[in-house]
A protein has these predicted regions:
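Basic helix-turn-helix/winged-helix DNA-binding cores
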Residues: 24-134
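Intrinsically disordered, low-complexity, charge-dense segments enriched in Lys/Arg
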Residues: 132, 136-204
Length: 204
């Protein structure tokens, strides 16, 4: 991102340049045709990440783990993982090592988080955020909060709800940081969806 100036030049369709507040990644002034808004909203309507208690406990091999995670992330369009990525995260100590080559809820929960964060933060910063989480909240609590907040932010960005909900009953610095990360991810997903819809319109 290049500061808080317009990051994308407006073209002759009448929409103005995108303005991103680096602190909150808020979007402004992107008028769109109604049918385009509807298509974007429909693409995300059924999105839901599995909660921690819903992640398979039987143990999944690497390729099964990749398919499981990517199937849930597919509606977002830009967060897929590959086997080499996962192996690298394990090698760097970013996520716990598999047990007898199998991945369980602990590893899978962290992989969902890394998938959301990897386009926004360096691996070093992701590692620091995971360390912060471990010292503050259990993984099931932190992971489920991420799921709820991501769905909350996405549905608001895509016009499926009028206002953001307050997720959780406590406030902390760690929670504020995670909320900011999730908000940023929702904006990136929104922008990718917007430009993909524009590309499709031009091809029609």
């Amino acid at each position: 991102m290049r500061g808080t100036e317009g990051c994308f030049a407006g073209e002759n369709r009448g929409w103005r340049a995108v303005y991103l507040d680096i602190g909150a990644f808020r979007l402004y002034n992107i008028p769109m045709e109604t049918n385009m808004k509807k298509r974007m909203a429909e693409s995300i309507r059924g999105f839901r990440l599995p909660r921690y208690a819903e992640i398979p406990t039987v143990g999944l091999y690497l390729e099964q783990t990749i398919r499981y995670i990517n199937a849930h992330l597919a509606p977002l369009g830009c967060m897929e993982l590959t086997g080499s990525m996962v192996s690298n995260y394990v090698k760097k100590g970013l996520i716990p090592a598999p047990i007898k080559k199998q991945y369980f809820p602990e590893q899978i929960g962290y992989l969902f988080f890394v998938a959301v964060a990897k386009n926004l933060m360096s691996m070093e910063h992701i590692d620091l955020l995971i360390s912060l989480q471990r010292s503050s909240y259990t993984l099931p609590v932190a992971y489920d909060y991420m799921c709820l907040e991501l769905e909350n932010q996405l549905f608001h960005r895509f016009g499926l709800k009028d206002a953001l909900e307050d997720i959780g009953i406590t406030e902390s610095e760690e929670k504020t940081i995670l909320r900011g990360l999730v908000s940023s991810a929702a904006n990136v997903i929104y922008l990718n969806s917007y430009f993909e819809q524009m590309r499709r319109e031009r091809m029609e």
